[in-house]
Swiss-Prot record:
Keywords: Developmental protein, Differentiation, Disulfide bond, Hydrolase, Spermatogenesis. One of its GO terms (biological process) is cell differentiation. Residues 201-345 are annotated as: NDK 1. Disulfide bonds join 39-42. Residues 6-115 form the Thioredoxin domain. PANTHER family: NME/NM23 FAMILY MEMBER 8, NME_NM23 FAMILY MEMBER 8. This is Thioredoxin domain-containing protein 3 homolog. Probably required during the final stages of sperm tail maturation in the testis and/or epididymis, where extensive disulfide bonding of fibrous sheath (FS) proteins occurs. In vitro, it has neither nucleoside diphosphate kinase (NDPK) activity nor reducing activity on disulfide bonds. Exhibits a 3'-5' exonuclease activity with a preference for single-stranded DNA, suggesting roles in DNA proofreading and repair. Residues 805-819 have a biased composition (Gly residues). GO terms for molecular function: 3'-5' exonuclease activity; nucleoside diphosphate kinase activity.
Amino acid sequence: MPAKKEQIQLQKEILNQEMWDELLSLEGLTVIDVYQKWCGPCAAVLSLFKRLRNEIGDDLLRFAVAEADSIETLERYRGKCEPCFLRYGSGQLVNVVRGVNAPALLKNVERELKQEHKVLEEGVERVVIKDPLLAAFEAEEQQAAQAEELEKKRLEEEARIKEIKELGDAGEVSVRPVSQGTVDTLMHGRQDGPQTEPVPKEVTVVLIKPDAVANGHVDSIIAKIEEHGFEILTTEDKTLTEDEAREFYKQHEEEEHFEVLVTFMASGPSKILVLTRGDTGEGVVSEVRNLLGPKDIEVAKEEAPDSLRAQFGTDKKMNAMHGADSKETAAREMAFLLPNFSVPIVPGTGPPPTIEKTLALIRPSALKDHKDEMLQKIQEAGFEVCLQKMVQLTEDQAKEFYKEQEGTPHFEDLIREMTSGEVLALGLAKESAIQSWREFIGPTTIDEAKEKAPDSLRAQYSIPDTQVNVVHGSDSVDTAEKELGFFFPKQTTLAVIKPDAAGEHKEAIIEKIKEAGFNISLQRDVELNKELASKLYLEHEGKEFYENLIDHMSSGLSMVMVLSREDAVDGWRTLMGPTDPDYAREHAPESLRALLGKDVLQNAVHGSSNPEEAKTRIERLFPDVEVLPGGEVKDSVASISMEQSQVKGEGEEGGEEQTEQPAGEGEEQQAEQPAAESGEQQAEGGEPATETATEGGEQQAEQPPAEGGEKPAEEETQQTQEGETPAADEAQAEQTQEGETPAADEAQAEQTQEGEEQKPAEEEAAPATEETAAEQAPAAEETQQTQEGEEKKEETEQTQDAPAAGGGEEAVATEGGGEGDAKPEGGEEKTEEQTAS
């Protein structure tokens, strides 16, 4: 009982969080015995603490016992049976001792009490620590949490991929790991945008002092730092002047060793490091100080033998390293030592980065021996290869590209090198790509590159016996755009989202298209009939799978698009991936067909094979547009959506509106295209035009006259002239019945006059069509005579006068619309009209 009373008098008993907080609010050194409720405080140290109190007799020294089970702050100390003594200097942890080591306890308490007096009375910096054991536990927990989070993400990704696989339109999809953004984009057509407010990472500054630099410990210290998971953001060698050292350590100017410290820090070069950790850097200041260890080398060797100061320091002054003691101090020291350094922001915060594109050329000599190695280095440096092409330049092309260097000493050598073999042209993308690439390849002059940037591409892969370097890079945004256009001219291509993907994944595919840098110039939802589908796959006609392919393409809605970009044809085919989804999953796992394709027929997307094919098929599916030589798309109407509108009116005004409004493909060409032009196109069109005209004529011959009589006169007349091309839509049918035909009359009359001059050529181009049109004209005349009014009679006369022009126009309209094989039944006419629009 007396012993218990003595213990209570010597050590204040702390039983709850409130008492703990009150204890730590007191000034001075507090030695706390942390115990478990089931075993009680450590009785072995009572005599030692009593002796200390009696010998020292200092009011700033106090002792306490704290029950870990009832104090929230001590939660991590629960369940530990080893005696643990925490020492707090005015509420801040300054030391931890585990186990009963009387000499160490005695020595440490005396030293720490003396240091606390200096802190309180002289303003000396207090060294605050984190319990090393708890720090290790927290690091393990953090690693476990990160591993758990990664596993959770992996399982979520697998679940999402499984979800894709279970969808009817997705088929067998690769179960490779993909990013959250990729899955979200493919599944939902969305990506989470970055936050708008930038959050800087927490960083700290470390100086490797002159003694450690002189002793050759820099590389070993850096290796130790990296082993502990710290990221070194930048390094710099710096020799402080005495004035700089005095300013840097001004908080210590009242200490007796201050001048010695200043002289030492100015005695040789130091190594400055800026460190962070993880995505946010949170807690990096205290973690680095724990790694450095106590300032006093003897204490460090005794209490933290694995610390950097214990391993590399010499004495208290020459203790190898300096580390900032707070975030504020780190910011001040960084501004003093590295004023131009920009602290990185936490990923996912701040505005999205500005991505630039630049041109890179690998010249023939380096390409022949080092292609794969150089490409690997480029990708490892963070550049994304968006465009890639092997090019054999002619001398004229090389001189045109480098015309601004004409007259320089090495111009002829440069042209000789650029034409000596194939050049690899790359379109690279990265944040600040232009400047980053120029820094990566090094100075233009080889000697300068080897001296100032020995790790650069120009230094590593230089060509012997020449001053021509191995790589080229654009030097500005304007130059990059111009040079990319030289090697990767802007093109237009046709893209089709097939029925198996158009319903479920259309928006996701469009998002991927935009991410790849394509501009969608035109797009329409189209239900292809077999005739139009066959035009898309002419090259596969006769193959075993051809009929199944045509059946699939005409089985539902597709989306047809016109895409524009540098090297658009090859770029879209790369994004699509190989035709066989199984092969694509193995060789191009990020491609659309790898992710969404089922088999070679249901492989999600289609694209043109070359620019010429793209132009032909775009103009076939979008007859109201023209693909210009530079790849641009010219729309012949103000708005695509205007095609579906109906303009109703009477008289001359209504006729003019009707002429401008593209009610159908055949009508548009009939109203706007002269007969002479038709003849030329007919001749140039070659075999497809002839075949279409013939097929159209055969179908006209088979058409029963009685069926034509049941239709409005104007509609049948146009069918006669156009070889059954479905040029008349519902709007035109209504307009015809109401007598709105002046525009068509004017167009036909004009074509008749021109047709008199061009008639011989047109008769040679399409004899079958002309004969058919002549045979059908009487039937059309009889039908038109049933209409009331003088206007209808004039229409009939003009229709009879223009059989030759109608025949020529028919061939052109059929070729342009790609619908010469249409059946005359009304229901199918309507389907083809919807397809054309």
